[in-house]
Every structure is written in structure tokens, then in C-alpha cells.
């Protein structure tokens, strides 16, 4: 009986760990627009390329696929499709997420700020 109780408690604890793990909560797009200031030094929120590629329609787009932008081979061959999970990892630590990419940005460590920024990027359609 004691083993069954221990097993049940362990299963519940693991369930909570999975539910509360690294899953990002929905962000606030209005706050994300403010966070985008960090991105706007290199990226436009429309189709225009600058130092970085334009981010219009970035969510759902294959990485390294904006016409007219000169991507690193690492980015072009990454097989990443930008979604909440891949954007979160890349925005948190670009070099860790995709070693050898050429984006000279250290990343955003704050999970809430990343959630907000991703929510804003989702509005760029």
C-alpha cells in the first residue's frame, strides 16, 4: 500500500513538472511591441531587409527564406520553421539555439519579455 501511495505521489509530481515545465505562456502583443525596439535596430516589421531580414510573416516561415537577404549557410540549412518554440529558443540565446549563425545579439533571458515579443511577432502578417 505504501508503494502505491509513493508511486501515486511521484506520478502527480511528474505531471505537475511536465505541465509547468518549459511551456511558454501566451504573451502580451502590446508589451511585445515595446520589446521589439531591441530587434528594430536590425529588423523591420515589414518586408524590408536591413542588417537583418524583414520580420513580416516570420511565424510559420522557414528560417533563411526571405528573398534578397544574405543568410549564413547555417541558417539556410537549419530546417527550422519559426514557431513559438523555435522563436523562444532562438530569441533566448541565438548562438546556443543555432551555433554559427551570424546574428550578433546576445538574446533575451526574461521569459515574459520573450513571450510578449513572440506574441507581437505573431501579429506581423
Where are these regions (language model features)?
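Short Fe-S-cluster ligation motifs
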Residues: 67-88
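Solvent-exposed helix-loop boundary motif
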Residues: 52-53, 57-73, 92
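Sec-exported extracytoplasmic/periplasmic mature domains
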Residues: 37-47, 60, 92-96, 122-125
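Bulky hydrophobic/aromatic "packing anchor" residues in well-ordered structure
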Residues: 14-16, 55, 103
Amino acid at each position: 500500500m505504501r508503494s502505491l501511495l509513493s508511486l501515486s505521489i511521484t506520478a502527480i509530481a511528474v505531471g505537475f513538472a511536465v505541465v509547468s515545465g518549459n511551456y511558454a505562456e501566451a504573451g502580451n502583443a502590446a508589451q511585445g511591441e515595446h520589446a521589439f525596439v531591441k530587434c528594430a535596430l536590425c529588423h523591420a516589421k515589414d518586408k524590408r531587409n536591413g542588417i537583418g531580414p524583414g520580420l513580416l510573416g516570420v511565424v510559420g516561415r522557414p528560417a533563411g527564406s526571405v528573398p534578397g537577404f544574405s543568410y549564413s549557410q547555417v541558417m539556410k540549412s537549419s530546417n527550422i520553421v519559426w514557431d513559438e518554440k523555435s522563436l523562444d529558443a532562438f530569441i533566448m540565446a541565438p548562438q546556443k539555439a543555432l551555433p554559427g549563425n551570424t546574428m550578433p545579439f546576445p538574446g533575451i533571458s526574461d521569459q515574459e519579455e520573450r513571450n510578449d515579443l513572440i506574441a507581437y511577432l505573431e501579429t506581423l502578417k
